[in-house]
Amino acid sequence: MVDKLQNIPEETWKEYVEKAYILGDRYERQYHGCGQCVLAAIFDTLDIYDENVFCAATGLSGGLGLIGNSTCAALIGSVLTFGLVYPRRREHFDGDRENKYRTFKMAQEMQKRYLEQYGSIKCHDIHTNLMGRPFDLRDPEERSAFELAGAH
């Protein structure tokens, strides 16, 4: 998986990002769970899949278990895929420094984009920025209000 992705031209990456964004939005509207929707969109765009990573992301959505005061699961899902493309592998735990720092740089850039676009990386703060207030997604009435406010 890793080898086929590491030498993709920058212009192709831009096309992949656009396609993944469109797919992620569609998946979020249909399935909900932003962390897994981002992963699914990126997996489908890059024609890769890792069941363990996808399953491990189950509890991330809604700012970690729907609580909302943690990092956006879509951001976490994105960073997880960076590690799949440029991994620090277990068998090279003391090595893979170039990949590790490349992934760090990509994660830093993604966080910067979130801060520029949403003013925060926290789920509740992003909801407030986009919809005027945070929502307690554990509460069915709040979940309905979240949907009515334009979330998906």
Regions found by a protein language model. Name each.
Residues 1-30:
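Polybasic, low-complexity association/targeting segments
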Residues 5-14, 42-59, 136-137:
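Acidic-glycine-rich active-site phosphate/pyrophosphate-binding loop
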Residues 19-47:
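Active-site-proximal helix-loop elements at catalytic-domain edges
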Residues 22-29, 61-70, 97, 147-152:
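A short glycine/serine-rich beta->alpha loop
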Residues 34, 72, 123:
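Short cysteine clusters
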Residues 40-44, 79-82, 95-152:
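Amphipathic alpha-helical interface segments
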Residues 59, 63-64, 79-81, 85:
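Conserved mixed alpha/beta catalytic, RNA-binding, or beta-rich assembly cores of soluble enzyme
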Residues 66-80:
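Conserved phosphate/anionic-ligand binding catalytic regions in large, soluble enzymes, centered on
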